[in-house]
Amino acid sequence: VRSRRQRQMCIRDRPAPEQADLAVLVSRFQSAGVPVKYSWIGRELPDDKGLQLTLFRIAQEAMTNILRYAPTTKRVEVTVSRHAGTAVLTVDNDAAPGSRPMHGSGKGLIGMRERAAVYGGTVDAGPTSTGWRVRAVLRWDEDDEGTSPWQMPL
């Protein structure tokens, strides 16, 4: 059994935008001993590296928070549902029976919300009947899939 610090070190590498692959992120967590189920529903994201990185970073923060604040998690489910200019990322974790949640500073949630806002999106987070859920919604113009808000002039 790995310590929490060892598990966090296993997923600490920061990818470049072209490496923002959720499947790779999930496999890092799995190799750190976190039981993760991953599913993608719908088409791939547009070829917008900023959008891809935003989705990746939100998932990374949500999953890292599971390691930090819910070390007794027995199952994590990561789902992306993409349709008509919208991607919905849901990260659910089920805590072990009798575990007590630990609370953080909230800065990670603020960062996730700021990232989502760049794409006209939102992030909601809170307890479920069995654990915790982070749900991010990102939006973009389907007719302009190649223009990232990150590339627009200030």
Q: Could you say what each language-model-derived stretch is?
A:
Residues 117-154:
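Flexible, glycine-/charge-rich segments associated with ATP-binding catalytic modules
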Residues 66-67:
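Short helix-loop "hinge" at the ATP-lid/N-box region of the Bergerat-fold HATPase_c
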Residues 75-85, 90-94:
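Short beta-strand/loop element within the Bergerat-fold HATPase_c
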Residues 62, 112:
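Conserved phosphate/oxyanion-binding catalytic-loop motifs
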Residues 38-59:
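Conserved short strand/loop->alpha-helix "switch" segment adjacent to the catalytic nucleotide/phosphoryl-transfer site
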Residues 85-88, 96-97, 128-135:
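Glycine-rich nucleotide-binding loop
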Residues 1-7, 11:
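Single conserved hydrophobic/aromatic residue that forms the stacking wall/gate
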